[in-house]
Swiss-Prot record:
Catalyzes the interconversion between ADP-D-glycero-beta-D-manno-heptose and ADP-L-glycero-beta-D-manno-heptose via an epimerization at carbon 6 of the heptose. This is ADP-L-glycero-D-manno-heptose-6-epimerase. It catalyses: ADP-D-glycero-beta-D-manno-heptose = ADP-L-glycero-beta-D-manno-heptose. CDD domains: ADP_GME_SDR_e (cd05248). The active site is at 139 (proton acceptor), 181 (proton acceptor). Its EC number is 5.1.3.20. The gene is hldD. Keywords: Carbohydrate metabolism, Isomerase, NADP.
């Protein structure tokens, strides 16, 4: 089984390569842009058949240069929600995705692609339906526009797809192999580094009607994201747009406390309550950044009805379980 993974040296892409390797699949064409070379570390311990630069891949794939490819996991994109260059964003996230889609349909190759919960933006309902899609930035719009294009070409539920097309609206993903993402890495990653350096972690103060640290997101562990992607690989008859979160919103305070307690326990210190951690200065609330006002999702929670109706019954880790596993990985990793 030959598989292509775009964005293969990135966070989700490299974890997908690992997940495929764990199944004994190594006939993998890894596609990425290693201009920022540090990302190579995400692939160094994995097995792939070939590496192709992203600038060369799309035309070569359209020409059939790689023979029969079973599926493309399309994770390659500009995922910086603070990026203001709309042309760059649309070229990378929309135009190239459209070209890849048409090539996949012509060659009978399945396409499993990364959409985003950013398509919902300011909505308070997170269900895969146009009336709830209100992106707050050009990143969210670039992802929404491709979803809309797929609906126009394939039908509302992708029922007219010649071969499988499945889009996954990732919520707040965290876990191993995200260290290259800088400011766009998860809050758990940043808090690990803060605690190691300063003995405390930082969270936004009150904003949007939420108390300090009380803003809520659907935080999903990377292992769960990989498991759902691979479930769809095993079920080629399933197409459509699907939320990929836990279906459970948890406050940022839960993440911070899981970070603090896991790292304290590694030092043989007792677990603390949120109140004690705040009182002891281990959780520090900072003023909400003016640059994010009006552009920030204070609440997200994936509606999993479509995913469950498709037959995927995967059980997702909660923040306490996933963050604890991630902290243990970070503490032992050489990154």
């Amino acid at each position: 089984m030959k598989i292509v993974v775009t964005g293969a040296a990135g966070f989700i892409g490299s974890n997908l390569v690992k997940g495929l390797n764990d199944r004994g699949i190594d006939d993998i064409i890894a596609v990425d842009d290693l201009t920022h070379g540090d990302k190579f570390r995400n692939l160094a311990d994995l097995q792939i058949a070939d590496y192709i630069d992203a600038d060369d891949f799309y035309d070569l794939f359209a020409e059939g240069a790689f023979g029969q490819v079973e599926a493309v996991f399309h994770e390659g994109a500009c995922s910086d929600t603070m990026e203001l260059d709309g042309k760059y964003m649309m070229d990378n996230n929309y135009t190239l995705s459209c070209e890849l889609f048409h090539a996949c349909q012509e060659q009978g190759t399945r396409l499993l692609y990364a959409s985003s919960a950013a398509t919902y933006g300011g909505s308070d309902t997170f269900s895969e339906s146009p009336e709830f899609e209100r992106p707050l930035n050009v990143y969210g719009y670039s992802k929404l526009l491709f979803d809309q294009r797929m609906r126009r070409e394939l039908g509302a539920r992708f029922e007219n797809a010649a071969t499988q097309v499945a889009g996954f609206r990732y919520f707040n993903v965290y876990g191993p192999r995200e260290q290259h993402k800088g400011r766009m890495a998860s809050v758990a990653f940043h808090q690990f580094n803060q605690f190691q350096a300063e003995g405390k972690v930082k969270l936004f103060g009150d904003y949007g009607g939420y108390q300090a640290g009380g803003q809520m997101r659907d935080f999903v562990f990377i292992d769960d994201v990989v498991a759902v992607n691979l479930w769809f690989l095993d079920h080629p008859e399933k197409s459509g747009i699907f939320n990929l979160g836990t279906g459970r919103a948890q406050p940022f305070n839960d993440v911070a406390l899981a970070v603090v307690n896991t790292l304290r326990q590694s030092q043989n210190a007792a677990a603390m309550s949120l109140e004690d951690a705040v009182r002891g200065g281990l959780i520090d609330y900072i003023t909400f950044p003016p640059a994010l006002v009006g552009k920030y999702q204070s609440y997200t929670q994936a509606d999993l009805q479509a995913l469950r109706a498709a037959g995927c019954q995967h059980a997702f880790a909660d923040v306490q379980t996933g963050v604890a596993a991630y902290m243990q990985w970070l503490a032992s990793a050489k990154i």
